[in-house]
Amino acid sequence: MFFHIVLERNMQLHPRFFGRNLKENLVSKLMKDVEGTCSGRHGFVVAITGIDTIGKGLIRDGTGFVTFPVKYQCVVFRPFKGEILEAVVTLVNKMGFFAEAGPVQIFVSKHLIPDDMEFQAGDMPNYTTSDGSVKIQKECEVRLKIIGTRVDATAIFCVGTIKDDFLGVINDPAAA
């Protein structure tokens, strides 16, 4: 799910960036350092939407660098247990399949795939229904439900299921 939150960060800036464009240099360094990163507590930072305050700089002894406390607004993505997501399948094997929803990788075990789907090995491994009408393979889009998350310092991993109503393949590029 997406959230709009306020975060704080201490930014160190080299003396060569001081001058008329100090604020612009500080904001561009903040965007470069923060956007696209993951903190286990807040999730993935998608975009910085605004700068609330830039505090007074503190000169670091011996280096000349200055540390500025910056308070900024940003959009973060953090998946939760029970959330329904649409994802793209990236890998299929006999244990299940992996899918990606934005920066989050989700594993769906073969035990969390409907019982009527069987694994088919070959050059394009997939899970296929007995009548062949539905096929889960690489690059197809699936709707799944998050049933568990594991949060590390720099990544979020999820376990999902498609063994529920209205879940499963929503778009198969191979069928088109």
UniProtKB/Swiss-Prot annotation:
GO terms for cellular component: RNA polymerase II, core complex. Keywords: DNA-directed RNA polymerase, Nucleus, Transcription. SUPFAM superfamilies: N-terminal, heterodimerisation domain of RBP7 (RpoE) (SSF88798), Nucleic acid-binding proteins (SSF50249). One of its GO terms (molecular function) is nucleic acid binding. InterPro entries: NA-bd_OB-fold, RNA_pol_Rpb7-like_N_sf, Rpb7-like, Rpb7-like_N, S1_domain. GO terms for biological process: DNA-templated transcription initiation. It is found in: Nucleus. CDD domains: RNAP_II_Rpb7_N, S1_RNAPII_Rpb7. DNA-dependent RNA polymerase catalyzes the transcription of DNA into RNA using the four ribonucleoside triphosphates as substrates. Component of RNA polymerase II which synthesizes mRNA precursors and many functional non-coding RNAs. Pol II is the central component of the basal RNA polymerase II transcription machinery. It is composed of mobile elements that move relative to each other. NRPB7 is part of a subcomplex with NRPB4 that binds to a pocket formed by NRPB1, NRPB2 and NRPB6 at the base of the clamp element. PANTHER family: DNA-DIRECTED RNA POLYMERASE II SUBUNIT RPB7 (PTHR12709:SF4), DNA-DIRECTED RNA POLYMERASE II, III (PTHR12709). Component of the RNA polymerase II complex consisting of at least 12 subunits. Interacts with NRPB4. Belongs to the eukaryotic RPB7/RPC8 RNA polymerase subunit family. This is DNA-directed RNA polymerase II subunit 7. It comes from Arabidopsis thaliana. The gene is NRPB7.
